[in-house]
Amino acid sequence: MKYSTIFSAAAAVFAGSAAAVGVSGSAEGFAEGVTGGGDATPVYPDTIDELVSYLGDDEARVIVLTKTFDFTDSEGTTTGTGCAPWGTASACQVAIDQDDWCENYEPDAPSISVEYYNAGVLGITVTSNKSLIGEGSSGAIKGKGLRIVSGAENIIIQNIAVTDINPKYVWGGDAITLDDCDLVWIDHVTTARIGRQHYVLGTSADNRVSLTNNYIDGVSDYSATCDGYHYWGIYLDGDADLVTMKGNYIYHTSGRSPKVQDNTLLHCVNNYFYDISGHAFEIGEGGYVLAEGNVFQNVDTVLETYEGAAFTVPSTTAGEVCSTYLGRDCVINGFGSSGTFSEDSTSFLSDFEGKNIASASAYTSVASSVVANAGQGNL
């Protein structure tokens, strides 16, 4: 009887622990309603092969990471000739000659020998109906990114880190790639020391995406600006994309934070942009940006290229126009030792009608809240 009681108690503890494993909270903004793997029984990969298999199969899954999965040297290395468009100083990134990029785009750049890890160049495929979550602060993928592409939908990535993807090399790999996907929520993810983009949404439609509470850490030994500030931050380049960015910490970058173009509607709300040595926004043709309640601190140039349209709520009174389209007023942004961001185009705000819209808080509490809550381990 005693052993039976002990066993029953242990089983109850295990069952309670298993039941507690899952996604925390729910998506806000365009990806509202995403369920990922739903109530599927959690699986705990132990090897990189198991992780790849779980992420890429046809099953609805809740995949829990309890350690670092290091892909760095899992596919060997390639040695070849690249180029150095930004110089040959020790802090400068150099470029892999992917698809003859050096010859086609930087023909005057000096050639240079490159050696990079093959695993980083192409990320792990994530198929539909997946929740990928980290346990505490321990779930990480090193040396390889994630790809949500080719019609994948209903995916949640939460509370993990993606790091150390050929940081010296442009075209060495992206942390998280989306292209031709729908209903994707990426939340409390830390990305650091990446060769190319921390986030890239490709040229096909990426419908209903929410990027929330993420930490884009731009500190790196190598950068295209040769100053330790990573240039390739967030690139939103899809066709008919709907993207919510809320509560993210964009830190120590020098450009593309974000770059928005090609029929992308971005709601950028309550993010903290801090210590950006170059520029934050590029808004190319077809980029439509509503920016409200953000804080820009020590951002030299908030907006560099402006060929699309943006409404940045230049005054409290100006923000009243949003009530017609969002059902509430928009809130002003905050600035400290930063450039200006006072665009007042409202012609595209009607595109928000009928969609799931993230709430907005006053900018005054954003910096402290984002620093405390963004990234892995801060659920």
Curated annotation (Swiss-Prot):
Where would one find the signal peptide in this protein?
A: 1-20
Catalytic residues?
A: R256
Give the Enzyme Commission number: 4.2.2.10
Localisation per UniProt entry: Secreted
Keywords for the protein's UniProt record, in alphabetical order: Carbohydrate metabolism, Cell wall biogenesis/degradation, Disulfide bond, Glycoprotein, Lyase, Polysaccharide degradation, Secreted, Signal
Q: What is its main location?
A: secreted
Q: Which family does it belong to?
A: Belongs to the polysaccharide lyase 1 family.
- What protein name is recorded for this chain? Probable pectin lyase A
Organism for this UniProt entry = Aspergillus niger (strain ATCC MYA-4892 / CBS 513.88 / FGSC A1513)
